[in-house]
């Protein structure tokens, strides 16, 4: 395998670059939660095995305009530094676990292709619609919105099949051993398989709940990314006893923090209607607070959480309006946006750039 020159970055959305002198460059743009970070790790690891150069970006909002901004900033850099990219036979933009770019606001390079790996029902743009603009530049389109798929499992399977095709079984099996178990463990949490598949074994349900605490108990998405990459470098796999022990620690520590946050949210709960409640909850605690609230208030059909710049929406499986529609309505009402899954979604209600100019009281007034 070729030797890589690798760099990690603290500023901006750029996280990681790897240069080995490959003939192809992969621009990986992913969401910043556990699923998005795992998706980026899957795409980056496949790039390494294929001996392709890569640059990884992670972004928190998952909004379409932010995907476009990241790509356009890279394109601006490329135009100013043509010698840094003209040697590539192909530059593949790999977008995972987030909205696609705004095609009317991006002018791709001649040798640029696009791949999209997502599972959010509220994000869907049909393949035929993208192909009308991109034509044969649309290289890979893997959108699966049922509970059996998340960004991690979609990128895992897509890269496994690509490695099988390009490098053969040996390379594909190495990739499988490194990332399959972890990716499917992420899926247990991210699409709420642990809660919504009754026949799931109890140990899988427990693991699913635990996985949801990982990105909440680590400093940042960049720290999570670097940690997973370091484990892969050291242990050659994420399916390792030390990793599962770390998950247990995250879960236990998170539970203690959530109990206090839940008590605070319950005291300040706003009853919107007989079936809808609004709770104040930081993103870090929102999932567990929603779970505990639903356990104690089974008649509620919708739980909305909010914090300084946005919030989340949960609806029960029998509720008539999908969560992503409610989230979109709230977000657009604040001149922002929202989306996600049928029963779990998120929204923005305060532009974080504007938030820099507001004091704490003003921020609370916005939400």
Q: Model features per residue range: what roles?
A:
Residues 198, 210-253:
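Long, charge-rich alpha-helical interaction segments
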